[in-house]
């Protein structure tokens, strides 16, 4: 569908099949668990509220323009899955929740994504397009692998890891490639 999907109530809602949903997703309370490899084709916003969780259930999930989260809640549990975050060209998304699990994160799209929490996921980070900005000390797990991999090096495109002014980041391994 194309309308806004809002998750309310403290219970867990599990979407049991792979889904492709093109409207915005807002998680205001409780947990939304993905039951299969899925695509949330529009913005995904998590409230800064205790108990608010997007749980990938170990699946690979595509989201666009991730935002929200915070010190009280609004976290993402990867399990062993891969979270693919696409930020549209010209957009600047900020996520302040914690991303945890053994899975990995892939940053796509030519916009920027700022991670503003000390994330604990261990599966590594791949930046294939746009900018991923470290907006807090060690936003990426210090033992994790980071790959900056781009097939385009045109003006204003490509892939970039940015450590924002005043912050530091320890990286387990850093590698890059271009096409």
Q: PLM features: residue spans?
A:
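Beta-strand repeat architectures
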Residues: 1-14, 22-93, 100-114, 122-179
């Amino acid at each position: 569908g194309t309308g806004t999907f809002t998750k309310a109530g403290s219970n867990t809602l599990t979407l049991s099949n792979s889904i492709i949903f093109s409207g915005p997703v807002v998680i205001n309370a409780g947990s939304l668990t993905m039951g299969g490899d899925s695509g949330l084709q529009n913005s995904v916003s998590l409230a800064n509220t205790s108990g608010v969780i997007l749980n990938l259930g170990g699946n690979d999930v595509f989201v666009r323009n991730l935002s929200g989260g915070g010190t009280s809640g609004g976290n993402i549990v990867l399990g062993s899955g891969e979270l693919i975050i696409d930020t549209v060209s010209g957009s600047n998304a900020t996520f302040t929740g914690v991303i945890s699990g053994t899975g990995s994160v892939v940053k796509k799209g030519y916009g920027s994504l700022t991670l503003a929490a000390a994330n604990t996921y261990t599966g590594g980070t791949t930046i294939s397009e746009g900018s991923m900005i470290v907006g807090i000390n060690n936003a990426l797990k210090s033992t994790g692998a980071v790959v900056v991999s781009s097939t385009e090096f045109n003006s204003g495109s490509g892939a970039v890891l940015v450590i924002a002014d005043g912050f530091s980041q320890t990286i387990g391994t850093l590698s890059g490639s271009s096409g």
